[in-house]
Design a protein with these regions (language model features):
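Alpha-helical bundle segments that constitute or directly flank the non-heme di-iron/ferroxidase center
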Residues: 45-56, 188
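Substrate/cofactor-recognition hotspot
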Residues: 77, 83-89
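Short, structured motif recognition centered on aromatic/hydrophobic residues
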Residues: 40-49, 78-79, 175-184, 213-217
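Glycine/small-residue-rich hydrophobic helix-like segments
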Residues: 171-208
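Winged helix-turn-helix DNA-binding recognition segment
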Residues: 70-74
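Acidic, glycine/proline-rich low-complexity segments that act as flexible tails and inter-domain linkers
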Residues: 1-39, 51-52, 56-63, 67, ...
Length: 222
């Protein structure tokens, strides 16, 4: 993270020792080991900061992502994707920050639409995407799951996958990386993280890339 953005989080004047420690760790250790593309790194960090509710750090990272040329649509898609995994109550501050900063950078809102489904096909297309990423077992869950699970399973296909995973703006590999960082940063979601680790491997994010994503998130989530 560049000096001016780090200083928005930690005052070099008031807390010079912590500033130096964090700056050294980020620049000499974490960034030096970076295996991700610029876009991947920023999307991973932004997603982790949403997951851990790191509002001040998110704003600083967002400034840096915009200056580094990350596509605003990709940033917006990461924020929208977070709605499925964090819930509306936790993503609103980040949505508002992203909108405000994009306008600061001269962008006109709303950005071009990226949705590909409608009321009639969101369930079917979402279920197809689920099966594509996680296997035929996802289809069986719609008919064979215990009755109390049926609503949640249907919503998972229609909303999480039909409304979000089918969108343009991020490819499957980027979207799975974003999702894993959102889950990782919340803590206590190991079962979900295992499932999405398999999902990442299935879309071509190999073990080295997943380790790289965790490394870039680590300074922000511990």
């Amino acid at each position: 993270m560049k000096e001016q953005n780090l200083n928005k989080m930690i005052s070099a004047q008031h807390d010079p020792e912590l500033y130096d420690i964090i700056s050294r760790f980020l620049e000499q250790d974490v960034h030096a080991a970076d295996q991700l593309s610029v876009t991947e790194r920023h999307l991973c960090v932004l997603s982790a900061l949403m997951g851990c509710q790191g509002k001040e750090a998110f704003m600083a990272e967002l400034h840096e992502a915009m200056k580094d040329g990350v596509d605003p649509i990709a940033i917006r898609e990461a924020v929208y994707q977070a709605a499925a995994y964090l819930g509306l109550g936790r993503i609103l501050p980040f949505l508002h920050m992203a909108d405000a900063l994009m306008q600061e950078h001269g962008l006109s809102l709303p950005l071009p639409p990226q949705g590909t489904t409608n009321d009639d096909d969101r369930f079917e297309k979402g279920l197809d995407k689920q099966v594509q990423l996680f296997g035929e077992g996802m289809r069986k869950q719609q008919s064979e799951a215990p009755q109390p699970r049926r609503n949640i399973n249907r919503w998972l296909a229609a909303n999480c996958f039909g409304d979000y995973y089918t969108r343009n703006g991020l490819n499957d590999a980027q979207r799975e990386l974003v999702t894993s960082c959102l889950i990782l940063a919340q803590g206590g979601c190991e079962n979900q993280l295992r499932g999405h680790t398999a999902g990442n491997l299935g879309v071509g994010n190999d073990a080295a890339k997943l380790y790289g994503a965790v490394e870039q998130c680590m300074p922000y989530i511990g």
